[in-house]
Amino acid sequence: VHLTGDEKSAVAALWSKVNVDEVGGEALGRLLVVYPWTQRFFESFGALSSADAVMGNPKVKAHGKKVLGAFSDGLAHLDNLKGTFAQLSELHCDKLHVDPENFRLLGNVLVCVLARNFGKEFTPQVQAAFQKVVAGVATALAHKYH
């Protein structure tokens, strides 16, 4: 992902304020509510029958935290996202058979959650930088599919 120095600074500054536990759970939960077909990958998580059930599900929250932990690792290696996400790409492609479009959807949901959580601090410039990052991460996660 090519980010300018200002974009890298903006991403790092905002990310340093992110509560990975909360934002991860909210982002994954919203993905499952807004795009209900993604729930098929999480049938073992139990109750996903309503928005309230999804958003309150401790397994959704725990996995969201794990997902955002991996995303944080990616932020530390923006110049090598394919390498950083190679194992996760292989897992999601070969074993879990996740549609790679879901990575793009989750990235966009994450941007929405960040905007909701940071309000005016999430300026259009910050959003543009994060859109580049989530697109790069989605591409890296989809790498094994090609």
UniProtKB/Swiss-Prot annotation:
The keyword Metal-binding applies. GO terms for molecular function: haptoglobin binding; heme binding; hemoglobin alpha binding; metal ion binding; organic acid binding; oxygen binding; oxygen carrier activity; peroxidase activity. GO terms for cellular component: blood microparticle; haptoglobin-hemoglobin complex; hemoglobin complex. CDD domains: Hb-beta-like (cd08925). The modification Phosphoserine is found at S50. Heme b binds at H63, H92. Residues 2-146 form the Globin domain. PROSITE patterns: GLOBIN. Keywords: Heme, Iron, Metal-binding, Oxygen transport, Phosphoprotein, Transport. SUPFAM superfamilies: Globin-like (SSF46458). Belongs to the globin family. Heterotetramer of two delta chains and two alpha chains. This is Hemoglobin subunit delta. It comes from Saimiri sciureus (Common squirrel monkey). The gene is HBD.
